[in-house]
Swiss-Prot record:
InterPro entries: Alpha/beta_knot_MTases, tRNA_m1G_MeTrfase_C_sf, tRNA_m1G_MeTrfase_TrmD, tRNA_m1G_MTases_N, tRNA_MeTrfase_TRMD/TRM10. Homodimer. This is tRNA (guanine-N(1)-)-methyltransferase. Keywords: Cytoplasm, Methyltransferase, S-adenosyl-L-methionine, Transferase, tRNA processing. It catalyses: guanosine(37) in tRNA + S-adenosyl-L-methionine = N(1)-methylguanosine(37) in tRNA + S-adenosyl-L-homocysteine + H(+). HAMAP family: TrmD (MF_00605). It comes from the Bacteria. Belongs to the RNA methyltransferase TrmD family. It comes from Porphyromonas gingivalis (strain ATCC 33277 / DSM 20709 / CIP 103683 / JCM 12257 / NCTC 11834 / 2561).
Length: 225
């Protein structure tokens, strides 16, 4: 899988996406991740990529020209399944969406910045707008990093244990059940006996019951009638 991220602050996410599991995925050739400095595609003497909005609105707006140039250039190199814009206006990013996007081959993620982007970019260049929550960040870099991490860990071979991703919280719209490791008892705090029993069917039943209970208690909005 290849993900191209367009940003004015590549250094903000470079270290985050070059370490741990995502870094190893790149080293093993399972994920190709490219960060593109949008300012490199500006023809302005000062490499500006924003300007004042028409109509007297406050703030600055990302210009259409440099964004069009870089997306057009990238599309001459390969076909892209989606051109994503990180925006609080977009559809909410969740685990099913991460699953869906992980099955694709090539993605472009455009990081929003300033007051917003020239609306023509949304009309003619963007195929999907995605939000990671109902709040506003300084820019879309953190949102792009969150989405990339969530998507990349689902690529076959990225995690040593594929079952780990399949049992994550939000798969099947349930929170994950409690997990424990050694020692079995610490300061009087015991691991549930069922997990030490070795009875796989009973353990699976317990885990499902715990997942349902935790979801009802902590995220009742996930429970469908």
């Amino acid at each position: 899988m290849r993900i191209d991220i367009i940003t004015v602050l590549p250094e903000m996410i470079e270290n985050t996406l070059n370490c741990s599991i995502i870094g190893r995925a790149q080293e093993r050739g399972l994920l190709e991740l490219k960060l593109h400095q949008l300012r490199d595609y500006s023809t302005d003497k000062w490499k500006r990529v924003d300007d004042y909005p028409f109509g007297g609105e406050p703030g600055m707006v990302m210009q259409v020209e440099p964004i069009d140039r870089i997306i057009t250039e990238l599309k001459t190199q390969r076909e892209y399944d989606e051109v994503i814009f990180t925006s609080p206006d977009g559809e909410r990013f969740d685990q099913p969406m991460a699953n869906e996007l992980s099955l694709l081959s090539n993605l472009i993620i455009l990081c929003g910045h300033y007051k917003g982007i020239d609306y023509r970019i949304r009309e003619h260049l963007i195929t999907r707008e995605i939000s990671i929550g109902d709040y506003v960040l300084t820019g879309g870099e953190l949102a792009a990093a969150v989405m990339t991490d969530a998507i990349a860990r689902l690529i076959p071979g990225v995690l040593n244990d594929a079952g780990s991703a399949l049992s994550d919280t939000f798969q099947d719209n349930l929170l994950a059940p409690p997990v424990y490791t050694r020692p079995a008892e610490y300061k009087g705090w015991r691991v549930p006996d069922i997990l030490l029993s070795g009875h796989e069917a009973n353990i699976a039943k317990w885990r499902l019951e715990q997942a349902v209970e935790r979801t009802k208690r902590l995220r009742p909005d996930l429970i469908k009638d």
